[in-house]
Design a protein with these regions (language model features):
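Short beta-strand elements
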Residues: 14, 24-32, 38-40, 125-147, ...
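Metal- or metallocofactor-binding catalytic centers and their adjacent structured scaffolds
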Residues: 41-107, 157
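Buried hydrophobic packing segments
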Residues: 60, 93-101, 105, 167, ...
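Glycine/threonine-rich beta-strand-loop-alpha-helix active-site module
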Residues: 107-125
Length: 389
């Protein structure tokens, strides 16, 4: 870019994310009145973040001040070389730089990053149940809604909100039941949370398997016990009143059965990651089914990109290009703890990311992302990205 505007100053501060943990906010200043701001949820502990902020102020900022604000790749590559600073500090400065440049040109962030090629919104995977939440009482890490039968972001968000409300009520009723050991055992053995979610979809007036599908992050790595070679299911064990363990073969059968009973279009982390033989066996079982075109084990046709592993916007762009050249789809992961910054929504549009995971619409920080998507839909029209799963 021919325009030259030197970076005047960089300031980074510690803030709080949605979980009350330390996060990072960065400001990049240029010219007399240009300021770009960005915040990134914390991945590191408080001491590491504070040390990273101090290092940015005392060392790295000096290397960046005076650089042309519009040379995003040069700035990002300099940040990427300094791997000793926390990822959240680096990414916050990278995004703040882009925001400042976009502001100077009076462009939206997605348009500045993606130019005229930024035309499609990412299709959504919307959090329905978090395995770490006490009310959910499940062993899977996440259950998500995939509203790929609904053609607009506005419609997808509306559906998710309606389903979420009914699903929360159903969970409260289930958890409030007493003296029903047989029912509890049945709920656990038959994928009770999935059953409740399916019922909530239907009560909200949507069709499972046509408008709404499910994505399952089994989180098998945390269930796997290396020493014994089995998968332990503590939540199911509590509901059944007896220890529940599954071998590789039993877990494959369990997952295969669930994908037959429920409209599951995506399986993430279904088995211990190093068990390639088991994953291939699961893929084969899904391929042998008549509805195999609806099923995918993550990594076969789509790749998850975790923002917590990305240091700069340039790194994200390059990663997207690499995956796309392999002929695979991309899902931009959500962070479990968030800030009120929707920059990654703009980045997803700019770089042509097909799908994006987002938190529950009832979460304030996630709502900021949904509201940004709604505004972008007004500008770009109802043009959704590729449905990876």
């Amino acid at each position: 870019m021919d325009i030259c505007l030197p970076i005047r100053d960089i300031y980074v501060r510690k803030i709080l994310d949605s979980g009350g943990s330390p996060a990072v906010e960065a400001e990049v200043l240029a010219g007399e009145d240009i300021v770009g701001t960005a915040s990134v949820a914390g991945q590191k502990g408080e001491q590491e973040i504070e040390a990273g902020i101090e290092q940015m102020h005392s060392q790295i900022a000096e290397e960046l001040i005076g650089k042309n604000l519009f040379e995003q790749e040069e700035i990002d590559h300099l940040l990427e070389k300094r791997k000793e600073i926390p990822q959240e500090v680096s990414l916050a400065v990278s995004i703040a730089t882009a925001r400042a440049a976009a502001g100077k040109l009076k462009l939206s962030l997605y348009r500045y990053l993606g130019g005229t090629h930024a035309l499609k919104l990412p299709a959504l995977l919307i959090l329905a149940a978090d395995g770490t939440a006490e009310e959910t009482e499940m062993d899977f890490r996440e259950l998500m809604l995939v509203p790929k039968g609904i053609s607009s972001v506005q419609g997808q968000i509306r559906a998710a909100g309606e389903i979420d409300s009914l699903f929360r009520e159903a969970l409260k009723k289930r958890n409030g039941r007493e003296g029903e050991p047989d029912r509890k055992k049945q709920d656990a053995a038959d994928g009770g949370v999935l059953k409740l979610l399916e019922k909530a979809v239907e009560e909200a007036g949507y069709q499972c398997g046509k408008e709404i599908f499910f994505a399952v992050n089994a989180g098998a790595g945390r269930l796997y016990e290396k020493q014994s070679g089995v998968y332990r299911f503590p939540a199911e064990s509590r509901r059944c009143g007896q220890r529940v363990e599954r071998s590789r073969e039993e877990l494959i059968e369990y997952l295969t059965r669930l994908t037959g009973e429920y409209p599951i279009s995506l399986l993430e982390d279904p088995l211990y990651r190093e068990d390639r033989e088991g994953i291939q066996e699961l893929e084969k079982k899904l391929e042998d089914r008549e509805d195999c075109e609806k099923k995918t084990v993550l990594g076969r046709r789509s790749v998850m990109i975790d923002p917590g592993e990305i240091y700069t916007l340039t790194e994200l762009s390059e990663r997207v290009r690499e995956v796309t050249e392999q002929g695979k789809g991309i899902i931009l992961c959500r962070q479990r703890k968030e800030t009120e910054d929707a920059a990654l929504v703009d980045a997803a549009v700019a770089f042509g990311i097909g799908q994006m995971k987002l938190g529950s619409p009832g979460c304030l920080e996630a709502a900021v992302k949904y509201n940004r998507l709604l505004k972008l839909e007004e500008k770009l029209g109802k043009s959704l990205g590729t449905d990876c799963p």
